[in-house]
């Protein structure tokens, strides 16, 4: 199988919360499947193999306490297709799990590419795989039970939030729910997270403009607002290119904003889309 993984740039930030306890979170950008990738993974009738896509970085992913990526495809079943209406083979999810990913973000502009059936099938496969997720839900009851997504590991409690700017004009079919960027909803979710006294609230935002190497005004304003409401760190996706990062300090507090991690697995050919970041966030307690 021909490997179509992107070039990876590795960055490490250590953010001190207060060193008796420590947790390492690893974030990657867009996990995509264009048609050339699907074709390259095809090994026999009805069978696909993606293991080589992650072979060079599997060890690094697995070393993190938590590895998180943006699943920017549906697992909507056959026929498998790339852009513009993504539906990846089920084997792709298994390869993602085998690579060491623990959590996938599902609120993005392609999560409804296969409509209600595709979104629900994606959720079903995530549930059966044991990979946790945030961003899309079969109904309101499931969202209330599962969101915000709380992670309890190494003595830490972390709340994970995920929202998207839109879904390419396709609307979620009731009772399905997609987390759209809406300040009223986000504020309620932040307050719900705060009530459980997490050590950190991390907002993963699918935002910005595609192929732009700088964040736009809306991204910057929303980032400021999120921090003001109590979000600790912000991780961005969607532009398919790397955008700047910021480390902000407020007294003894430190806040990371990653405006865009770029692509992680893709077959894009536009300028600057062939690079992405592995972002490692280390939190410590004294």
What residue ranges belong to the model's regions?
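Positively charged n-region of N-terminal signal peptides that target proteins for export
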Residues: 1-5
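Acidic, metal/ion-coordinating pockets
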Residues: 19-286
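N-terminal signal peptide c-region/cleavage motif recognized by signal peptidases
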Residues: 14-16
């Amino acid at each position: 199988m021909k490997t179509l993984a992107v070039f990876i740039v590795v960055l490490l930030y250590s953010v001190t919360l207060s060193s008796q306890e420590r947790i390492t979170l690893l974030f990657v950008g867009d996990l995509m499947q264009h048609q050339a990738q699907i074709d390259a993974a095809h090994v026999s009738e009805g069978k696909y193999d993606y293991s080589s896509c992650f072979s060079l970085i599997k060890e690094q992913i697995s070393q993190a306490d938590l590895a998180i990526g943006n699943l920017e495809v549906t697992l909507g079943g056959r026929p498998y297709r790339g852009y513009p209406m993504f539906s990846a083979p089920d084997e792709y999810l298994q390869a993602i799990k085998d690579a060491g990913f623990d959590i996938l973000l599902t609120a993005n502009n392609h999560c409804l590419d296969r409509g209600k059936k595709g979104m629900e099938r994606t959720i079903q496969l995530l549930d059966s795989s044991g990979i946790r997720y945030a961003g899309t839900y079969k109904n309101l009851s499931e969202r209330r039970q599962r969101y915000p997504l709380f992670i309890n590991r190494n003595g830490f409690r972390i709340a994970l939030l995920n929202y998207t700017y839109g879904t390419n004009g396709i609307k979620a079919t009731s009772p399905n729910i997609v987390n759209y960027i809406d300040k009223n909803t986000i504020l309620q979710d932040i307050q719900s997270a705060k009530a459980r006294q997490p050590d950190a609230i991390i907002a993963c935002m699918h935002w910005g403009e595609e192929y732009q190497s700088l964040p736009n005004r809306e991204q910057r304003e929303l980032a400021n607002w999120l921090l003001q409401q109590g979000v600790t760190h912000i991780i961005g996706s969607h532009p398919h290119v790397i955008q700047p990062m910021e480390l902000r300090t407020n007294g003894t507090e430190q806040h990371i904003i990653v405006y865009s991690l770029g692509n992680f697995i893709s077959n894009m050919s536009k300028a600057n889309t062939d690079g992405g970041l592995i972002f490692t966030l280390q939190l410590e307690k004294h």
